[in-house]
Amino acid sequence: MPQLNPNPWFFIMLLSWLTFSLIIQPKLLSFTPTNPPSNKTTTHTKTTPWTWPWT
């Protein structure tokens, strides 16, 4: 069964992970987010429960 032979597939997987880790990931992490996190506190609105007419 050729799919159980790890000879070509392990090398392809290893090469793809190394490509991702060494080339693609640093390029993606260098981008600045469009909405940086802020220290603003969130406001919670008080909601009233719905009154069901049949209860």
From Swiss-Prot:
GO cellular component terms given for this protein: mitochondrial membrane; proton-transporting ATP synthase complex
Bilayer topology term: Single-pass membrane protein
Record's keyword annotation contains Transmembrane helix: yes
Chief subcellular location: mitochondrion
Record-level GO BP terms: proton motive force-driven ATP synthesis
One Pfam family in the UniProt entry: ATP-synt_8
A GO molecular-function annotation: proton transmembrane transporter activity
Membrane-spanning intervals of the chain: 7-24
Record field: compositional bias (Low complexity): 37-55
Subcellular location: Mitochondrion membrane
Region of interest called Disordered, as start-end residue ranges on this chain: 35-55
Keyword hit for Membrane: yes
Keywords recorded for this protein, A-Z: ATP synthesis, CF(0), Hydrogen ion transport, Ion transport, Membrane, Mitochondrion, Transmembrane, Transmembrane helix, Transport
Subunit-level organization: Component of the ATP synthase complex composed at least of ATP5F1A/subunit alpha, ATP5F1B/subunit beta, ATP5MC1/subunit c (homooctomer), MT-ATP6/subunit a, MT-ATP8/subunit 8, ATP5ME/subunit e, ATP5MF/subunit f, ATP5MG/subunit g, ATP5MK/subunit k, ATP5MJ/subunit j, ATP5F1C/subunit gamma, ATP5F1D/subunit delta, ATP5F1E/subunit epsilon, ATP5PF/subunit F6, ATP5PB/subunit b, ATP5PD/subunit d, ATP5PO/subunit OSCP.
Family membership noted in the UniProt record: Belongs to the ATPase protein 8 family.
Purpose of the protein: Subunit 8, of the mitochondrial membrane ATP synthase complex (F(1)F(0) ATP synthase or Complex V) that produces ATP from ADP in the presence of a proton gradient across the membrane which is generated by electron transport complexes of the respiratory chain. ATP synthase complex consist of a soluble F(1) head domain - the catalytic core - and a membrane F(1) domain - the membrane proton channel. These two domains are linked by a central stalk rotating inside the F(1) region and a stationary peripheral stalk.
Name of this chain's protein: ATP synthase F(0) complex subunit 8
Annotated organism of origin: Chaetura pelagica (Chimney swift)
